[in-house]
């Protein structure tokens, strides 16, 4: 995890020599520095998978993909929203279905819809040679598609965003509390824990809490 939280999100997934970024919500300079720290460069990246168009997920995406000619994969709704934000990267943009399976290099990528207040949010599962990692962040609920796609995943990066009682009694304005708590907001600690238990019963053994 190169960055996680409301100030920026970026995740590196490596699968048999294929390196992918999920989101680019920090500056391109920070991403390049983080890659350099682990012995990689943008030239080693096979593509950027975009979950949705909120700023904390796209802050560095235009600069990174344009400067280094990296393919950018996004759902149609996210792609259109990205262009409306004047971060249009149409020359490197590749539209993918909101649900389905495709391959980039050695990585098999499963796409599934999430429930977030964005144009057409998605998340991913990446499989290679019997190993798998799933990503489920920025969703108000665990969608049926996410539940199905993530069964048996080896490691899950899982949103665990808030304690509901603490959030309600905290300093955030009412409208923001309602947004976070809503079905198209963010996953609560309790909901994340319940989903993690279900996956653990199916064999998932590693969880990384995020956002």
Feature-to-residue mapping (PLM):
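Metallo-beta-lactamase
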Residues: 76-131
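Active-site neighborhood of phospho(di)ester-bond hydrolases with catalytic His/Asp-centered motifs
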Residues: 22-25, 45-53, 73-76, 134-137, ...
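A short helix->loop->beta-strand "cap" motif at the edges of active sites that frequently abuts
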Residues: 18, 68-71, 201-206
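Structured catalytic core of nucleotide-sugar glycosyltransferases
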Residues: 2-10, 51-61, 66, 83, ...
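Conserved catalytic scaffold of divalent metal-dependent phosphoesterases
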Residues: 100, 106-111, 115-116, 129-133, ...
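Conserved beta-strand hairpin/beta-sheet module of binuclear metal-dependent hydrolase folds
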Residues: 1-38, 122-138, 155
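Active-site metal-binding motif and surrounding structural segment of the metallo-beta-lactamase
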Residues: 27-74
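Cap/insert and terminal regions of metallo-dependent hydrolase folds
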Residues: 144-210
């Amino acid at each position: 995890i190169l960055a996680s939280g409301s100030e920026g999100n970026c995740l590196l997934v490596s699968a048999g020599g294929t390196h992918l970024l999920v989101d680019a919500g920090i500056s391109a300079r920070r991403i390049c520095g983080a890659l350099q720290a682990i012995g990689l460069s943008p030239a080693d990246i096979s593509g950027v998978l975009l979950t949705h168009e909120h700023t904390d997920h796209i802050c560095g995406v235009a600069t990174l993909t344009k400067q280094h000619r990296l393919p950018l994969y996004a759902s149609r709704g996210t792609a259109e929203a990205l262009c409306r934000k004047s971060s249009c990267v149409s020359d490197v943009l590749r539209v993918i279905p909101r649900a389905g399976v495709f391959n980039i290099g050695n990585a098999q990528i499963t796409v599934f819809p999430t429930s977030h207040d964005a144009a057409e949010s998605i998340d991913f599962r990446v499989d290679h040679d019997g190993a798998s990692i799933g990503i489920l962040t920025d969703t108000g609920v665990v969608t049926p598609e996410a539940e199905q796609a993530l069964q048996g995943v080896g490691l899950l990066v899982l949103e665990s965003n808030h304690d509901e009682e603490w959030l309600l009694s905290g300093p955030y304005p009412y409208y923001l509390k309602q947004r976070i708590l809503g079905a198209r907001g963010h996953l609560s600690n309790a909901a994340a824990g319940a989903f993690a238990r279900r996956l653990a019963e199916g064999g998932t053994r590693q969880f990384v809490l995020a956002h």
